[in-house]
Amino acid sequence: MALQDVVTREYTINLHKRLHGVNFKKRAPKAVKEIKKFATLHMGTTDVRLDPKLNIAIWKRGVQGVENRMRLRISRKRNDEEDAKEKLFAYVEPVIVPSTKGLQTVVVEDDE
C-alpha cells in the first residue's frame, strides 16, 4: 500500500503505558502529544490534526484523569491548500465504544 492512499482506520491506543510515571499535572498535555506521535507513526505524515471532540474526551476527567485506553479513528486525507508543505494530513477523532476490550485495528470504508 502506497503512502499516497487516502485511508481511514480505527485504533485502540493504550495511553496508560505512555503516561506511566508522568507528573499528574502534565498527563493530559502529554496524552495529546502521544496521540499525535501515534498518528504520525501509523499514518506517515507529520501534519496531524485533532478533532475538538477528541480534546474534550481527553480533558473530560481533568488534567490527571486521562483514560487508560481510547478508541481513535485516524484518517489520512489530501491537503488541498495551495502552499501546503505536505500533500497529506492525518485527522484524529474519538470513537465512542462501551468497552475497548478485544477491539482490533479496523479499516473503515468511507462514503466520500
From Swiss-Prot:
Signal peptide (from-to): none
Matching SMART domains: Ribosomal_L31e
Keyword Ribonucleoprotein: yes
GO molecular function: structural constituent of ribosome
Keyword flag Ribosomal protein: yes
GO terms classed as biological process: cytoplasmic translation
Superkingdom assignment: Eukaryota
The entry's keywords: Cytoplasm, Ribonucleoprotein, Ribosomal protein
Major localization class: cytoplasm
A Pfam family this chain is assigned to: Ribosomal_L31e
Subcellular location: Cytoplasm
Record CDD domains: Ribosomal_L31e
Gene Ontology cellular component annotations, sorted alphabetically: cytosolic large ribosomal subunit; preribosome
Family classification: Belongs to the eukaryotic ribosomal protein eL31 family.
PANTHER family, per the entry: 60S RIBOSOMAL PROTEIN L31
Summary of subunit composition and partner proteins: Component of the large ribosomal subunit. Mature ribosomes consist of a small (40S) and a large (60S) subunit. The 40S subunit contains about 32 different proteins and 1 molecule of RNA (18S). The 60S subunit contains 45 different proteins and 3 molecules of RNA (25S, 5.8S and 5S).
Known role: Component of the ribosome, a large ribonucleoprotein complex responsible for the synthesis of proteins in the cell. The small ribosomal subunit (SSU) binds messenger RNAs (mRNAs) and translates the encoded message by selecting cognate aminoacyl-transfer RNA (tRNA) molecules. The large subunit (LSU) contains the ribosomal catalytic site termed the peptidyl transferase center (PTC), which catalyzes the formation of peptide bonds, thereby polymerizing the amino acids delivered by tRNAs into a polypeptide chain.
Protein name: Large ribosomal subunit protein eL31
Annotated organism of origin: Candida albicans (strain SC5314 / ATCC MYA-2876) (Yeast)
Lineage of source species: Eukaryota, Fungi, Dikarya, Ascomycota, Saccharomycotina
